[in-house]
Amino acid sequence: MTKFVFVTGGVVSSLGKGIAAASLAAILESRGLKVTLLKLDPYINVDPGTMSPFQHGEVFVTEDGAETDLDLGHYERFVSAKMRKSNNFTTGQIYESVIRKERRGEYLGKTVQVIPHITNEIQAFVERGAAASHDGKADVALVEIGGTVGDIESLPFLEAARQMSLRMGRNHCAFVHLTLVPFIASAGELKTKPTQHSVQKLREIGISPTALLCRADRPIPDDERAKISLFANIPQDAVISVWDADSIYKIPQMLNEQGLDRLICEELRLDPKPADLSMWQKLVNAQENPEHEITIGMVGKYVDLTESYKSLIEALRHAGMHTATRVNIEYIDSEELESGHLEVLAPLDAILVPGGFGKRGTEGKIRAIQYARENKIPYLGICLGMQLAVIEFARHLAGMTDANSTEFNLETEHPVVALITEWVDREGKVEQRSADSDLGGTMRLGAQRVPVKEGTKAATIYGAEVNERHRHRYEVNNHYVPTLEKAGMVISARTPTENLPEMMELPESMHPWFVGVQFHPEFTSTPRDGHPLFKAYVEAALASQQRKGA
């Protein structure tokens, strides 16, 4: 039977519950246990797909096409299990499911209430999500409950967790509570009172934490840990100090050294082999002792909120670990490039335009792409970044001066990028969309296998086939592909059924390394293995740096 570890947060949000849960899962996996993770989000949105990146940060896309919380990206980077749609659900999905059941008459005329109907549905979703991994044979499922203890939105989830613990019995559920111990500069000391109140609030709900993870900007002294232990009624060895680290990949070792995995295994009556964190130590060592250093310019419109590009930033770091390179990222606001200021691009070793939506800032991105092409700076375009590379090429090399995407200009004379209205999804089903379709859940989503053209950079990087995840509505217009190819562009990968361009590149006679991809490779990069495309991109940046210095 799968055992559960519920991870909750107190005092404030953004303490890093997702990284804490993923780190604990990584330690348990290193002990030979089969682990999976779930994220429960208390907002009423069905999923984060239509939420602003400023509100929510990145939307992480799973292999089966779910638009999910960015914490699922952390989960996949820390453990070997692949996340699915069932690994993330929201209050909106729970209420939607309960209301559908009520309309079908499944409650037999009963008054439908938060308790027991909503809490029962939450428990069913949790158990179904845990059963989706490892053929239903996961040893431990870590369940992160979003929000903060005390928020009205989180109460049904916490109550469901309490009921699960009661129903399953002792030694089948554990609770890890993440809380803040702030340092007050004027007093020159750490304050434990917020943590005491947070634990008290949790105990009022009926939950006593197995372990307390105390977040601070510095290690918490033993006397403060003893004080927290006394007032929170938790053994002192279960009060874990989690201080700010310069790399999230140091957290598994930090938690293991303080015995968190031992506490959880004892609580759940598990007796696995000792933890082996040598892989994590090796990765941290590679990160801290690089042989090279490069600077990549990321040109976007959400650059003030880097959470919007979380998986992409981590993918570049992974590539750095696997090429002995420190990768510095310069965030460049594309709107500032629209009025000039291209001189900020000159010192860069490579330029990257990530995915995005909407017209704002696109002309600045196109100017950055033109600069990269004309100055032979390695370029990687992802999703929108590929579409804009096609537009730039069409305007300046293929004679279509007003080329554009119908996303930005419906009246353009040359719609080289247009709305995709019909395609075959990963399960072979025909999907159809129009400009009037709902925004939520109507994109081309999830992983798809695509053959690669021989003799291209894409083939050198990927081999014969690409299997990557998508999240987009617009595609390169096949009508213009012959004209683009005649001007020198290489379409190096196409979908097998609709023949839609998936990868484009420029031949070496035109540019040393210029690649665009319609998919999102950052979602499949892990610190363990890196990603072939990002490794090739970093290597191209290193080569460019050497050419400049020669």
Curated annotation (Swiss-Prot):
Mg(2+) binds at D71, E144. GO terms for biological process: 'de novo' CTP biosynthetic process; pyrimidine nucleobase biosynthetic process. UTP binds at S13, K191, T192, K193, P194, T195, Q196, K227. L-glutamine binds at G356, L384, G385, M386, Q387, E407, R473. One of its GO terms (molecular function) is ATP binding. The active site is at C383, H520, E522. Pfam families: CTP_synth_N (PF06418), GATase (PF00117). Keywords: ATP-binding, Glutamine amidotransferase, Ligase, Magnesium, Metal-binding, Nucleotide-binding, Pyrimidine biosynthesis. Residues 1-270 are annotated as: Amidoligase domain. Belongs to the CTP synthase family. This is CTP synthase. It comes from Cupriavidus necator (strain ATCC 17699 / DSM 428 / KCTC 22496 / NCIMB 10442 / H16 / Stanier 337).
